[in-house]
């Protein structure tokens, strides 16, 4: 029954919006500026997501939705550090471990609608060890605002929030909020025809996901 309910909720996010056929980030009004909810973000087991620990962020849509998030270098001709955040094509691929750290240094669990830093926790060479924090960068060629990994300062990397899609199903989305404003935008999927990869980018339609412990 839960699976059917989740499919129904997710279908609402997949309906086309003809008024936004061109990229136009949606302005969101955050429900809470601070953690006023008593329920933390929960993983697929129903356990609290702990601050500073590693998790997989995996598409909640089985099938065409893809798997988990990975840090890759889409430009094979470049020697730069991997910086592209993609959704794995395989449902069975959980992706790379991601550390979620609240902006509040006293927080022990991750609360919805509060600022977080996302960083990949993967082995890299010494030159790329700090190029793992999430941020947003504009791509002039495609016109997209992509989620990228790099040496973002804290003010730029902790502008993400986890928002509840359905609190009974432990399904969530991510919003990105412009620093110093209340304007927030959905983080969704963008299919890049040049690289044939599905990338995370600001979008009208959110990327709906579940959170898996890395020890599963």
Curated annotation (Swiss-Prot):
Keywords, ordered alphabetically: Signal, Storage protein, Vacuole
Upper taxonomic lineage: Eukaryota, Viridiplantae, Streptophyta, Embryophyta, Tracheophyta
Localization per Swiss-Prot or TrEMBL: Vacuole
GO cellular component, one term: vacuole
Tissues and organs where the protein is expressed, per its UniProt entry: Accumulates specifically in tuberous roots and tubers upon tuberization. Sporamin accounts 60 to 80% of the total soluble protein of the organ.
Name of the gene encoding the protein in the UniProt record: GSPO-B1
Protein name: Sporamin B
Major location (coarse): other
Coiled-coil parts of chain: none
GO molecular function terms noted in the UniProt entry: endopeptidase inhibitor activity; nutrient reservoir activity
């Amino acid at each position: 029954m839960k699976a059917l309910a989740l499919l129904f909720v997710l279908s609402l996010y997949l309906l086309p919006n003809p008024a936004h056929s061109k990229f136009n980030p949606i302005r969101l009004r955050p429900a809470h500026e601070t953690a006023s909810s008593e329920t933390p973000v929960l993983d697929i087991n129903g356990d609290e997501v702990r601050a500073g620990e590693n998790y997989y962020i995996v598409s909640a849509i089985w099938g065409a939705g893809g798997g988990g998030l990975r840090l890759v270098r889409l430009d094979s001709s470049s020697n730069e550090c991997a910086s592209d955040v993609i959704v794995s094509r395989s449902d069975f691929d959980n992706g790379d471990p991601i550390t979620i750290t609240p902006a509040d240094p006293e927080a022990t669990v991750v609360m919805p609608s509060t600022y977080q830093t996302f960083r990949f926790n993967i082995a890299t060479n010494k030159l790329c060890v700090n190029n793992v924090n999430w941020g947003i960068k504009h791509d002039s060629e495609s016109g997209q605002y992509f989620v990228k990994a790099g040496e973002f300062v804290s003010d730029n990397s902790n502008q993400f929030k986890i928002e509840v899609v359905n609190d009974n199903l432990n399904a969530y989305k991510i919003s990105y909020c412009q620093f110093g404003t209340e304007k927030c935008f959905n983080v969704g999927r963008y299919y890049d025809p040049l690289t044939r990869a599905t990338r995370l980018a600001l979008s009208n339609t959110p990327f709906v996901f579940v959170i898996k412990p890395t020890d599963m």
